[in-house]
C-alpha cells in the first residue's frame, strides 16, 4: 500500500517527537530523544479505524538546529527553510503531503516570533496549493503549542497565542491538554488523534462494514435519542449542541469552501455521536 505523508516542522524542544509518538504509538521514539538533531527523521506508522486502514510516514524536520537561537535567527532560518521547500527540488514532497503540523514552544517562543512565524506558515500553505488555485489543497495545517514537562504557561498567554493562530485561519492545538472542552470538542492530545483519524486521506483501504452490526448500532442510538426525548429525567443537552453548532459556524468562516464541506461533515458526525 502506498503510504500517506505528514510533516511535523518546528524548532528544537517544541514537541515534535511527542506528537509523532502520539500518532504512531511507536515504542522506539523515546530513544530518539537522545539524538542531537531531529531533522530528516521518518517515523513509519499504520492506522486502523473501524472504517479504514492506512500506512503513514511521519516526516520530522527542524528549521533551526540550535536551542538558544534568537527570534531574529529563528525567523531567518524558518524563511530559508520555506524558500527551499517551495523550490522545484521539493515539488514531489509537496505533492504527497496530506498534512503539516507546525510546533511552537509556548514557554520560550515570544509572541512577536510566533506572529511573524505564522506569516511564513501562511506562505507555506499557499505553496502547497495548485498554481492556478492557491488555496486548492486538500490537506490540513495545525499549529501545536507545547510546554516543557513540569513547567506552566499562563492561561492568558495561551489564549493570546490561540487568537493569533485563529486569525490566520489555522487551527491551534494545546499539546498540554486532553479530553474535551466545554463544547464537547476534543482538545489537545485527543484532538491530534481525532484530526488524524478524521482526515480524508489520499491512500487508504476501506474496511468492510458488517451491515447487521451497523443496523444494531443505529437502532440502539435511535432508542437512546427517543428515551431522551420522552423521559423528563433525561437531559438532551440541547444547549451544548447549539453552542457547538455556533462555534463551528464561526470557525467555518475562516475556511475555504472545500475545507468548510469537510469540516461540516466532521461536525455532523460528532453531533450524531454525541447524541
UniProtKB/Swiss-Prot annotation:
InterPro entries: Irc6. Keywords: Chromosomal rearrangement. GO terms for molecular function: protein-macromolecule adaptor activity. Disulfide bonds: none annotated. GO terms for biological process: vesicle-mediated transport. Belongs to the IRC6 family. Involved in gross chromosomal rearrangements (GCRs) and telomere healing. This is Increased recombination centers protein 6. It comes from Candida albicans (strain WO-1). The lineage of its organism: Eukaryota, Fungi, Dikarya, Ascomycota, Saccharomycotina. The gene is IRC6.
Amino acid at each position: 500500500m502506498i503510504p500517506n505523508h505528514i510533516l511535523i516542522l518546528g524548532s528544537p524542544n517544541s514537541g515534535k517527537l511527542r506528537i509523532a509518538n502520539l500518532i504512531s504509538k511507536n515504542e522506539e521514539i523515546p530513544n530518539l530523544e537522545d539524538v542531537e538533531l531531529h531533522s530528516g527523521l521518518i517515523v513509519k506508522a499504520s492506522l486502523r479505524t473501524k472504517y479504514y486502514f492506512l500506512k503513514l510516514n511521519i516526516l520530522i524536520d527542524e528549521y533551526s538546529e540550535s536551542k538558544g537561537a534568537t527570534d531574529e535567527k529563528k525567523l531567518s532560518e524558518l524563511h530559508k527553510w520555506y524558500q527551499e521547500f517551495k523550490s522545484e527540488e521539493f515539488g514531489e514532497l509537496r505533492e504527497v503531503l496530506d498534512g503539516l503540523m507546525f510546533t511552537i514552544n509556548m514557554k520560550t517562543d515570544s509572541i512577536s516570533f510566533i506572529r511573524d512565524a505564522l506569516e511564513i506558515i501562511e506562505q507555506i500553505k499557499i505553496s502547497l496549493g495548485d498554481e492556478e488555485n492557491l488555496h486548492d489543497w486538500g490537506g490540513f495545517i495545525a499549529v501545536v503549542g507545547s510546554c516543557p514537562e513540569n513547567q506552566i504557561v499562563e492561561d492568558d498567554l495561551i489564549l493570546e497565542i490561540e487568537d493569533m493562530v485563529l486569525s490566520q485561519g489555522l487551527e491551534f492545538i494545546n499539546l498540554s491538554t486532553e479530553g474535551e472542552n466545554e463544547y464537547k470538542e476534543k482538545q489537545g492530545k485527543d484532538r491530534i488523534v481525532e484530526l488524524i483519524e478524521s482526515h480524508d486521506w489520499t491512500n487508504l483501504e476501506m474496511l468492510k462494514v458488517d451491515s447487521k452490526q451497523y443496523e444494531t448500532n443505529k437502532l440502539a442510538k435511535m432508542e437512546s435519542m427517543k428515551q431522551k426525548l420522552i423521559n423528563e429525567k433525561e437531559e438532551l443537552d440541547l444547549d451544548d449542541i447549539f453552542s457547538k453548532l455556533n462555534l463551528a459556524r464561526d470557525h467555518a468562516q475562516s475556511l475555504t469552501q472545500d475545507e468548510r464541506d469537510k469540516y461540516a461533515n466532521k461536525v455532523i458526525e460528532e453531533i450524531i455521536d454525541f447524541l
